[in-house]
């Protein structure tokens, strides 16, 4: 296959990679790439976004050098065109600031209190978080020059804070002269209250507005705090105007937060990325990684057994490993399925009597597609809403035993509209890898609310 004379250079590379990566990775990152022009000196490719370019070069640069033409420096001679804007972006290695020998005196106040365990190299990737990790790595390499702000949202314990701190570590190590601050929303509010009390609000404003990178965790705690929201929004706008990078995390997408339209619009300026519930294979990888850190040898079959029963979030998986490690060491017990079952019986989810509901489907779809639940039930034709509404109907027909008439009534539509939506989505997922992945994320989120249905 690799020596087929009828295959172009790019096709040979694609055929080679297809046998060496997962089906999901191939469909999400390689399949969407289109060849615009190919010659013996250069290949011009169309990509859906800049993160596909980063993923391709970060993971397959060595393989690319074996197939595609090379430039004078020995790098793949590729030129990328982002599909959305049709603007050529010649391949250039990101210019990383050279590490300074020491941090200057004026920057010592900006030293970070980051979790040393939260780095990119120990963040376990899977279909549910591959895009958001690539996005975070992309903005860390080029702060203020990619998507700004980066808004990361997802449920509890899925890795949002890990990625936030990973950005901080990466920028601190590669851009040592940049001023960085990582803070929770509650800490920001407390900081503001303190400076108001001692009448030094200008000092606080000067501090935040002199930053090069602001990392804010749990922005949802800004809800229903209008005065604090206004000050945060002013700081936010100032930094964006100065091309300073901002990364924000939340448990909900911007449109679902009870914040002013002004700040929601600012949050949606850049890139909104969702961290989904990890699938089975990713949970197994997380378990094995955590076990290795604890010095616990966990066989594959045991890892799969645990992952099949503990699937809410990463923190629960880590808790399972901690408990198993302690039990095996204290009682000198071997790690068997019986040991796991006895030790983790409180963590294992009891069979749920709850069925999948239209509301749980709407909640999941709204989160993944970044739309409002009320829009899914209405007739809005705003961006992303019609497709998201069809996906919700498709999932309802797939996961709920109700009649098409009943499902249609839940959406305020007729049964024929539901049927049309289902047929449309079925056709699209055959060709659209991104949509297929989004639907998979929706199902994973729904499974957390209605686990028994997915057993």
From Swiss-Prot:
Localization per record: Cytoplasm
Annotated region (Domain III, AAA+ region), positions in chain: 113-328
Recorded GO CC terms: cytoplasm; plasma membrane
Keywords, ordered alphabetically: ATP-binding, Cytoplasm, DNA replication, DNA-binding, Lipid-binding, Nucleotide-binding
Any GO molecular function: lipid binding
Region called Domain I, interacts with DnaA modulators, residue ranges: 1-95
Stated induction or repression of this protein's expression: In infected human Hep-2 cells, transcripts are visible from 11-48 hours post-infection.
CDD domains per record: AAA, Bac_DnaA_C
Residue span of region Domain II: 96-112
Residues covered by region (Domain IV, binds dsDNA): 329-455
Signal peptide range in chain numbering: none
Primary residence: cytoplasm
Keyword Lyase listed: no
Protein family per UniProt: Belongs to the DnaA family.
Function of the molecule: Plays an essential role in the initiation and regulation of chromosomal replication. ATP-DnaA binds to the origin of replication (oriC) to initiate formation of the DNA replication initiation complex once per cell cycle. Binds the DnaA box (a 9 base pair repeat at the origin) and separates the double-stranded (ds)DNA. Forms a right-handed helical filament on oriC DNA; dsDNA binds to the exterior of the filament while single-stranded (ss)DNA is stabiized in the filament's interior.
Subunit structure: Oligomerizes as a right-handed, spiral filament on DNA at oriC.
Comment on protein domains: Domain I is involved in oligomerization and binding regulators, domain II is flexibile and of varying length in different bacteria, domain III forms the AAA+ region, while domain IV binds dsDNA.
Descriptive protein name: Chromosomal replication initiator protein DnaA 2
Gene: dnaA2
């Amino acid at each position: 296959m690799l020596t087929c004379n009828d295959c172009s250079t790019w096709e040979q590379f694609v055929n080679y990679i297809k046998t060496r990566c997962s089906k999901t990775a191939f469909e999400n990152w390689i399949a969407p790439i289109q060849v615009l022009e190919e010659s013996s000196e250069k290949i011009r490719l169309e990509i859906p976004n800049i993160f596909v370019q980063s993923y391709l070069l970060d993971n397959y640069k060595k393989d690319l050098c074996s197939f595609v033409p090379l430039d004078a420096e020995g790098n793949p001679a590729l030129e990328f065109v982002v599909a959305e804007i049709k603007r050529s972006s010649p391949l250039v290695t990101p210019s990383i600031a050279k590490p300074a020998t020491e941090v200057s005196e004026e920057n010592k106040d900006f030293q970070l209190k980051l979790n040393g365990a939260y780095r990119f190299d120990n963040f376990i990737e899977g279909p549910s978080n591959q895009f958001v990790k690539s996005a975070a790595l992309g903005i860390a390499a080029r702060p203020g020059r990619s998507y700004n702000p980066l808004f990361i949202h997802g449920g509890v314990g899925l890795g949002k804070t890990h990625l936030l701190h990973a950005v901080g570590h990466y920028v601190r190590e590669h851009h040592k002269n940049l001023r960085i601050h990582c803070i929770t929303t509650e800490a920001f509010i407390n900081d503001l209250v303190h400076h108001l009390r001692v009448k030094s609000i200008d000092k606080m404003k000067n501090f935040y507005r002199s930053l090069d990178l602001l990392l804010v965790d749990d922005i949802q705690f800004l809800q229903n705090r209008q005065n604090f929201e206004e000050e945060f929004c002013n700081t936010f706008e100032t930094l964006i105007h100065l091309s300073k990078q901002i990364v924000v995390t939340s448990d909900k997408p911007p449109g679902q937060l009870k914040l002013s339209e002004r700040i929601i619009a600012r949050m949606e300026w850049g890139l909104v990325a969702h961290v989904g519930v990890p699938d089975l294979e990713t949970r197994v990888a997380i378990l094995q990684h955590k076990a290795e850190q604890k010095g616990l040898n966990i066989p594959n079959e045991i890892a799969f057994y645990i992952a099949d029963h503990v699937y809410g979030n990463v923190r629960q998986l880590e808790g399972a490993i901690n408990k198993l490690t302690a039990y095996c060491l204290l009682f000198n017990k071997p790690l068997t399925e019986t040991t796991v079952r006895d030790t983790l019986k409180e963590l294992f989810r009891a069979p749920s009597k709850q069925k999948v509901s239209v509301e749980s489907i709407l909640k999941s779809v709204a989160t993944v597609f970044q739309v409002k639940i009320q829009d899914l039930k209405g007739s809005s034709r705003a961006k992303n809403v019609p497709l998201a509404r069809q996906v919700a109907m498709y999932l309802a027909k797939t996961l709920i035993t109700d009649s098409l008439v009943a499902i249609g009534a839940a959406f305020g539509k007729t049964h024929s509209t539901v049927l049309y939506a289902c047929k449309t989505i079925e056709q699209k997922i055959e060709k659209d890898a991104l949509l297929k992945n989004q639907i998979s994320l929706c199902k994973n989120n729904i499974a957390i609310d209605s686990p028994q249905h997915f057993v």
